Structures are given as C-alpha cells and as structure tokens.
C-alpha cells in the first residue's frame, strides 16, 4: 500500500517536536501487514553533532533507535485510529529487546527506516526495525512499546 506523510502531517499524529522529532517523511504505511517506511535526513546542523564528536561527527545510536521507534509509534497510532479507538494517544518505550549498530551515520546521510509490527495488541506492541543508509544496514532493533491515552 502506497502512502506518504510529510513532517507537518507526522506532527498531527506524533507529539514529538524539534529538536526531538527524528523522522522527516513517511514513505509507506501498510496497516494490514503492520509495516512502515520512514526517512531521516541527517545534517550537520543537528545539535548532537556539537559534542558527538566534533572531530568525527556520528549520530548517536540511541537517537537512531528513537527515530525507529517514532516510525513504529506512527504506525501504532494510525492502526488504533483505523480500528476506531478514539482519543489522542502517545506511544511510550516499554523496552529494547535487542539493538545492534553496524556502521556510523554521519552528516549528509539519509536513513531509511523499515519497521514492522511483530506482535501488536490493543495497547502493547513489539516492533522490529532496520535502519539503512545507501542500502546498507546501519542499525537494527527489536523494541517494545505501550499505547497510552493522553
């Protein structure tokens, strides 16, 4: 299923704002198969590059995982809306089952996040994500999340 959401449309669903909104676009959303594909354009203007690391700027791995989680949260909230669950929701981290970092992400990179729901229930879910730059996997993780009504 083809789908597109720009950053303004993402902010209608997710509560995150600058400097912590870490996805720029949703390229695909398939609620029947619980899959989402999102983009993060990494620029040298990101605040974290001031100290991580000035001589070799690398995006912190925890922020790559957070961006992956935000893509998963977008999917979970849209799924809840499709199922008729009313109200505003926030998706909270409930755990990181596993995470691996394969290559550094640097300014100028575009990260493609491919996230799928492995076991999504009404208010809890497990998601699996892969982050890629130029077709190469830079990180992967299995995350737990909880859907909480605001």
Feature locations, PLM:
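Hydrophobic beta-strand-centered segment that forms part of the acyl-chain substrate-binding groove
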Residues: 1-4, 73-112, 138-140
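HotDog/MaoC-like acyl-thioester-processing domains
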Residues: 2, 35, 77, 105-109, ...
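Small/polar/charged residue-enriched interaction surfaces, especially the RNA/DNA-contacting tracks
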Residues: 3-4, 16, 38-41, 91, ...
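Short aromatic-glycine motifs in intrinsically disordered, low-complexity regions
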Residues: 7-17
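Beta-strand-rich interaction surfaces with strong enrichment in secreted/lumenal proteins
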Residues: 11, 55-56, 100-103
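Catalytic strand-loop segment that frames the active site of acyl-thioester-processing enzymes
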Residues: 18-59, 64
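Conserved positions in beta-strands of structured domains
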Residues: 24-27, 97, 102, 116-118, ...
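Active-site helix/loop of acyl-thioester processing domains in fatty-acid/polyketide metabolism
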Residues: 26, 59-85
């Amino acid at each position: 299923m083809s789908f597109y959401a720009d950053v303004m449309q993402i902010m209608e669903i997710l509560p995150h704002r600058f400097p912590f909104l870490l996805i720029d676009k949703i390229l695909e959303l398939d609620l029947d198969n619980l899959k989402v594909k999102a983009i993060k354009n990494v620029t040298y203007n990101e605040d974290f590059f001031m100290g991580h690391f000035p001589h070799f700027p690398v995006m912190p791995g925890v922020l790559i995982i957070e961006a992956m989680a935000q893509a998963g949260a977008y999917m979970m909230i849209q799924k809840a809306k499709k199922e008729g669950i009313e109200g505003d929701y926030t998706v909270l981290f409930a755990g990181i089952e596993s995470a691996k970092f394969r290559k550094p992400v640097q300014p100028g990179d575009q990260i493609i996040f491919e996230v799928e729901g492995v076991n999504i229930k009404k208010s809890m879910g497990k998601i699996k994500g892969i982050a890629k730059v130029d077709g190469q996997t830079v990180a992967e993780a299995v995350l737990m999340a909880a859907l909480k009504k605001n």
